[in-house]
């Protein structure tokens, strides 16, 4: 078992199903969580509210790690025309604003965009993708390029932007209702009251995940909360988990395939965009979300406000 796999599984256990010693550690770190929460709350005040003349929708979550924001953003883009995605571009090797995609043309490299932005760029229904640390500048650029709707990936905490906030509520909740580092929350849990819509799996959207069993495949992934792929672990000969946004090396993947006498990598699309030029045979784990009427109609109602 690799160090990366140990690290990811330890974090998953610590935040969601801690053992006795991990619970003790969480309480030892509680003073740090109080300081973290204080400064996180301060950061949400004292900024002038910015209002746009077109719809801005945010998809976010309170807890650390992935909850399905990317598939939900894609689902919104499939339902509505003219969607641009604006995101920070976490772990990219660039600074400032980059137009990753504009009207079906990819305009930058993976190192400039980051893996999540490039995953969005390959989605046909998404008309544009922009990465920017400054979300306001990213939104302005998107509308300048012709966006009808801007969807912000992971921007719930950007309370200075007037937007429709969709907060994803995971089926698997953190063990403690503490902020980091004692718990998995990035903002105190009471902040969920500031959401315009709390989206619950099963009630407001349905998640689909599919891949065929392949005994000649090694499942490799670098996503947050890899246990989300649990149902697929038995479909490959071996599984390896790396840190979220990990930059794969061709040689290490070759060694994993040789070690298990396999010829195929089983990956999510987010992982695939980082290895597509390596020349490996790949099998994609399909991760999709379908909106239910409760969420779809709320979004439609919000968008119609701008048509008046």
From Swiss-Prot:
Q: What are the annotated GO cellular component locations?
A: plasma membrane
Q: Name one GO molecular function term.
A: ATP binding
Catalysed reaction(s) here are:
a lipid A disaccharide + ATP = a lipid IVA + ADP + H(+)
Q: Which GO terms describe its biological process?
A: lipid A biosynthetic process; lipopolysaccharide core region biosynthetic process
Q: Which domain of life is it from?
A: Bacteria
Work out whether the entry's keyword set contains Glycosyltransferase: no
Q: Name one Pfam family in it.
A: LpxK
Q: Which residues bind ATP?
A: 63-70
Q: In which pathway does it act?
A: Glycolipid biosynthesis; lipid IV(A) biosynthesis; lipid IV(A) from (3R)-3-hydroxytetradecanoyl-[acyl-carrier-protein] and UDP-N-acetyl-alpha-D-glucosamine: step 6/6
Q: What is its EC number?
A: 2.7.1.130
Query: What are the protein's UniProt keywords?
Result: ATP-binding, Kinase, Lipid A biosynthesis, Lipid biosynthesis, Lipid metabolism, Nucleotide-binding, Transferase
Asked if the record carries the keyword Hydrolase, the reply is no
Q: What the protein does? A: Transfers the gamma-phosphate of ATP to the 4'-position of a tetraacyldisaccharide 1-phosphate intermediate (termed DS-1-P) to form tetraacyldisaccharide 1,4'-bis-phosphate (lipid IVA).
Q: Which family does it belong to?
A: Belongs to the LpxK family.
> What protein name does the entry list?
Tetraacyldisaccharide 4'-kinase
The scientific name of the source species is Campylobacter jejuni subsp. jejuni serotype O:6 (strain 81116 / NCTC 11828)
């Amino acid at each position: 078992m690799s160090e990366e796999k140990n690290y990811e599984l330890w974090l998953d256990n610590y935040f969601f199903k801690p053992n006795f010693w991990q619970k003790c550690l969480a309480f030892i770190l509680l003073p740090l969580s109080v300081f973290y929460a204080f400064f996180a709350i301060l950061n949400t005040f004292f900024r002038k509210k910015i209002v746009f003349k077109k719809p801005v929708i945010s998809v976010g979550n309170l807890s650390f790690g992935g909850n399905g924001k990317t598939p939900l953003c894609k689902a919104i883009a499939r339902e509505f025309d003219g969607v641009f995605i604006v995101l920070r571009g976490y772990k990219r090797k660039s600074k400032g604003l980059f137009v990753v995609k504009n009207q079906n043309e990819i305009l930058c490299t993976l190192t400039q965009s980051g893996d999540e932005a490039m995953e969005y760029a390959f989605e046909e229904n998404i008309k544009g993708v922009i990465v920017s640390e400054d979300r306001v500048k990213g939104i302005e650029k998107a509308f300048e390029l012709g966006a009808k709707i801007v969807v912000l990936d992971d921007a719930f905490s950007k309370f200075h932007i007037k937007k429709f906030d969709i907060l994803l509520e995971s089926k698997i909740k953190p063990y403690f209702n503490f902020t980091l580092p004692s718990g998995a929350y990035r903002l105190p849990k009471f902040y969920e009251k500031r959401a315009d819509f709390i989206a619950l799996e099963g009630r407001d959207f349905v998640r689909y995940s599919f891949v065929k069993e392949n005994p000649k495949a090694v499942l490799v992934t670098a996503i947050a909360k890899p246990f989300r792929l649990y149902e697929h672990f038995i479909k490959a000969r071996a599984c390896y988990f790396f840190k979220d946004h990990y930059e794969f090396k061709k040689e290490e993947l070759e060694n994993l395939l040789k070690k298990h006498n396999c010829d195929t990598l089983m990956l999510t699309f987010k992982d695939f965009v980082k290895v597509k030029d390596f020349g490996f045979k790949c099998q994609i784990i399909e991760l999709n979300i379908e909106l239910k009427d409760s969420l779809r109609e709320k979004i439609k109602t919000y968008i119609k406000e701008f048509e008046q």
